[in-house]
Design a protein with these regions (language model features):
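Phosphodiester-processing cores and adjacent nucleic acid-binding clamps
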Residues: 1-162
């Protein structure tokens, strides 16, 4: 791999992100080598199913695997008159073995508590409890900060970001 690396993808959905990802794990490491990417993060939606397979296959091609997950998060408490929690995705990336352990705990929390629609989610207390050694990417209009801004809740967005 040359030293002219241009890009490291930090939000890639694989075939394990049902109805969202099309990237086949078998072809990902070769594509990274071909595109001169020294590392890539697989951040499937609400699961870590590919973590081991991805780590082994990427490492075997000299590509640094970055393990992460896009987790649906309940980003605000229910207000009077609301019946469903507001949910938005956050991308969490493990910085270390401890971060990976926390990512697995959060992934388990997803399926221990569902909203009334039966959708998996974590709340802010769980996210705060297991946040050590995790990098959080909240960008995009569909994320919690973008959603709060779109709803005109600027102070809440600033509070959430901090």
């Amino acid at each position: 791999m040359s030293s002219a690396a241009k890009f490291v993808h930090l939000r890639l959905h694989s075939e394990y992100s049902l109805l969202q990802g099309a990237m086949r794990l078998k072809s990902l490491p070769d594509l990274c080598v071909e595109e001169n990417m020294p590392a890539v993060a697989v951040t499937d939606k609400n699961n870590l199913f590919c973590a081991l397979e991805f780590s082994v296959s990427a490492s075997s091609k000299g590509v640094q695997p970055i393990i992460g997950c896009q987790i649906d998060t309940q980003y605000s408490e229910l207000k009077v008159g609301e019946t469903l929690p507001k949910i938005a995705p956050l991308v969490l990336i493990a910085q270390s073995e401890n971060g990976y352990q926390n990512l697995m705990k959060l992934n388990s929390c997803l399926y221990l508590e569902e909203d009334k629609r039966g959708l998996p989610r974590v709340d802010l207390l769980e996210l705060e409890k297991y946040s050590d050694d995790l990098i959080c990417l909240s960008g995009g209009p569909g994320g919690p900060i973008g959603s709060l801004i779109a709803d005109g809740q600027i102070d809440e967005a600033i509070n959430y970001a901090s």
